[in-house]
Amino acid sequence: MRFSKQIVTIAIAVAATWTLSSVTSFAAERSLYERLGGVGAIQAVVTKFIGNVGADKRINGYFKNADLKQLNKHLVDQVCQASGGPCTYAGRDMKTTHKGMKVTTAAFNALVEDLVSALDTFNVGKQEKDELLAVLGPMKKDIVEVP
């Protein structure tokens, strides 16, 4: 009787380990775009993000003349493409877009805070947040003109 309990225990442990590794492997194979929830979820986050920026007195002046509908579309396409989705960003490059705006490091950091707040609103996981920020972060050098 004792021998069979040990076998059952070992079998359960092996099955649990196999199942866990399969789930982990499956999650790792999914693109960031898929893990974010696709274009609909990205659209929701971007809309919230733009709202956050509009309410943020530290940086909303940079956007006073922006076409918010066009900005929304470009940001959705940019995040979708950057995260491995099927969208294509067709807007201007970041250096051209921000030339002469005198964006400061503090303003850029405030923008990132507003993005993180939008991601948090939709309970985006830490891994996905970190990956998205890592993909978008290199744009800083083309956006910030005043360190």
Description of each model-found segment:
Residues 26-147:
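Core of compact, soluble alpha-helical bundle domains
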Residues 1-4:
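N-terminal secretory signal peptides that target proteins for export/translocation
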